[in-house]
Amino acid sequence: MGIRIYKPTSAGRRNASVSDFKELTPGYTPERSLLRPKTKTGGRNNQGKITSRHRGGGHKQKYRVIDFRRVKDGVVATVDSVQYDPNRTARIALLKYPDGEKHYVIAPSGVAAGDKLQNGPDAPPVVGNCLPLKNIPLGTSVCCIEMRAGRGAVMCRSAGTQATLQAREADWAQLLLPSGEVRRVPSACRATIGQVGNSDHMNIVLGKAGRSRWLGRRPHVRGTAMNPIDHPHGGGEGRTKGGRHPVSPSGKSAKGGRTRQKRKPSNSSIVRRRKSRRYGQLKLHK
């Protein structure tokens, strides 16, 4: 993909940029059988309480049903088109199987209309194919990785992400993730060969607040600008937060505090934690 930079014809256009969408298939239409209605929540739960701040509004969207499991083995599918998905940063590819079945999958970089893709242990390790980690050569870049066999891909699904298969031992495979974390996953788990497309997404500049609102993002108000009833940093005369370390509205440490569960089952699968810009190499949970 490429990025198109706008001319500074107004304050909102200055420094703004947008994808050129050249990787998309011209003239495609979304597959209606794979579309579902998407209800907006505004960041509220079933009690009407805000559980995710700064959410609300945005353009109306329809959800695209993505095949994250890719268990239709032994059949060669044809990429009908590469399409835009408003629900994620990556592009999606529409696969057509010989029996007429159609599936959406995350489109790796380099996949285009007309390509042939396969799933299963007998598939060749080429970009776009999905196969178990035990059948993938060491050093290969992979994406859309399962953490439990048959549960579907959960890691490396956003634009431009990829992991590297570093080693295999017994029934486990060792992966270097984009964050720098090294993690073990069962070698029976599946992954897609290649890097997720739309890698320049991180370089796009929205340019104005309105484009954030189109995406359903509401303003992020500072705690020091609030009243004491609304935030621990609120109130006071002038710009002061009462001598307190930065915290969230609920009082949790906002800069570097651990929020991960200490006894989370997947902690045992982490070989090396990521490197933090602030604290350097992080230690494993004990």
Swiss-Prot record:
Part of the 50S ribosomal subunit. Forms a bridge to the 30S subunit in the 70S ribosome. This is Large ribosomal subunit protein uL2. HAMAP family: Ribosomal_uL2_B. Residues 255-286 have a biased composition (Basic residues). The lineage of its organism: Bacteria, Pseudomonadati, Planctomycetota, Planctomycetia, Pirellulales. Residues 22-59, 215-286 are annotated as: Disordered. Residues 230-240 have a biased composition (Basic and acidic residues). Belongs to the universal ribosomal protein uL2 family. GO terms for cellular component: large ribosomal subunit. Gene3D superfamilies: 2.30.30.30, Nucleic acid-binding proteins, Ribosomal protein L2, domain 3. One of its GO terms (molecular function) is rRNA binding.
